[in-house]
């Protein structure tokens, strides 16, 4: 027992050292420059959504950045290091929460380690300094509140609202928490709408900047890469709206089909569908299913992790190593499709094994 505990502790410390080492190697990147621009605009009380097209989120995150920048100045540090430390704390909290969701004990420690040592999570939080993991942490909090023996509906709604306020990558998840025949303790539809109302209300102080909000937040489509549904535009005569239409139709179908699926599995499958069909992509999006996937593991999770890690090694926005035959955008997409197919097959097997 002591040896096992020592091994787990050593593994967590090694993962922590790797995260800190990667963080200390980063001085700036494109997104950090965008964050700095948002901070500078807020400091002089400028028009956040009109003066730059590079801030695409709710105002809440901009004010978090302002606070982190102030803390960095007082500590004689940099925004990169302060932001990285902030993200590291949330990843550590995510690992602890995953351990609780996994039931604690040996399995809980293993699930926490699978996430905390995952190269994809390390790359996104410590190298890219992206904050998707913060939004996903609050999604996990909502899941934890919903799955308690006596579900905490208020906590679920608050956590879903916080997740959307941080980054609206979880915009399609609240309907999964609605009451169904299988999830009788789920949220009423009105309660599930609260996170959207909170997200919309966060923009009220910036109502005069509506044109910028519409263009840079609601109209933001990320990067156009040769990935997933964007390849539909290679079809001669394909309309420009086709990838978005396929994406929205896929999300709608998933929300309907997943109503009878256990909540944590439904959340994972929705994250996979979202990432498979999203019409615009950035490489840090690949962290979206990592925390949820750690709860179930499996061959699909492993293959996807390896594919994304190899992609980061060769990506110009990653380590840009001069190695040939590393997977590109298509390789990651196919690994994601494999993971999705394996999860669907697992779900079907569990359904057949369930008592009638």
Walk through the language-model features, giving the residues of each.
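C-terminal multi-pass transmembrane helix bundles with aromatic-rich, positive-inside signatures
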Residues: 296-356
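Hydrophobic/aromatic-rich transmembrane helices and adjacent perimembrane loops
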Residues: 138, 172, 282-310
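Primarily membrane-embedded glycan-assembly and transfer machineries that use lipid-linked glycans
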Residues: 2-148, 180-273, 278, 282-283, ...
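Alpha-helical transmembrane segments and their helix-entry boundary regions
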Residues: 108-112, 136, 153-160, 171, ...
